Amino acid sequence: MDAKQTRQGVLLALAAYFIWGIAPAYFKLIYYVPADEILTHRVIWSFFFMVALLSVSRQWRQVKRLLKTPKKIFLLALSAVLVGGNWLLFIWAVNNHHMLEASLGYFINPLVNILLGMIFLGERFRRMQWLAVILAVCGVLVQLWTFGSLPIIALGLAFSFAFYGLVRKKIAVEAQTGMLVETLWLLPVAAIYLFGIADSPTSHMGQNALSLNLLLMAAGVVTTIPLLCFTGAATRLRLSTLGFFQYIGPTLMFLLAVTFYGEVPGADKMVTFAFIWVALAIFVMDAIYTQRKK
């Protein structure tokens, strides 16, 4: 990868993780809307936002080319399921007072990224990277052994998003066209659920306040912009390098949870956080050292 692509990847990764870091504040504004309904709005409005974006940028030719490759279309169905599951779990966690565990999941994610990079992409581990991954695993095992609890939400978020990044990197499609097809795969299910199954005080948009409907529609922008940045970064950077930036998002989430939303980390969570933070410190120092050697 050339220097220009790398610079673009870095900027896109920074933008993606910053927006994701402050995204919980948006979902807290609509905490009274069920998580599954918010997910359907994310899918529906993201699809229409992508249609508008592709129309403005005149990139429908790329969509036509993509539609001629059935293998990529079906792989995008897999990535759609992965990202849809990740979205649902994240929304539920934030609006059910598990923002700290959500942040833990995204602290773990860069370490899962380098693990998947080694297993599926042939990327080699350096010694310090091995140490970082081992410490992260130890943190989860200590929580399980000592406190009898397992960070299910954190692990679910970490692995679903890591596999999503891996699949998108293997498909190697342009960010916007890939996002359009992913939301197109999810659109029928989302529409059937929202308009045919969901029955809550907020599920009927015609009866909602205009302010609520605008917030629900904004889910498309909140979802699409950082995801486009991420998928753009994933095609320009090594998966292990991409993991380097992900501490930005969970750090912002952690600060939001503790400072603004009154979540207090228990002893079990703090043990795991401590291991993960040490692992990330080692990972970052190793990355900086390696970069300087180059």
From Swiss-Prot:
Keywords: Cell inner membrane, Cell membrane, Membrane, Transmembrane, Transmembrane helix, Transport. GO terms for cellular component: plasma membrane. Residues 1-11, 61-72, 123-128, 168-179, 235-238, 291-294 are cytoplasmic. It holds the Pfam family EamA. It is a multi-pass membrane protein. The keyword Phosphoprotein does not apply. It comes from the Bacteria. Residues 18-145 form the EamA domain. The chain crosses the membrane at residues 12-34, 38-60, 73-95, 100-122, 129-146, 150-167, 180-197, 212-234, 239-261, 271-290. It is found in: Cell inner membrane. Residues 35-37, 96-99, 147-149, 198-211, 262-270 are periplasmic. InterPro entries: EamA_dom, RarD. PANTHER family: ACYL-MALONYL CONDENSING ENZYME-RELATED, SOLUTE CARRIER FAMILY 35 MEMBER G2-RELATED. Belongs to the EamA transporter family. This is Protein RarD.
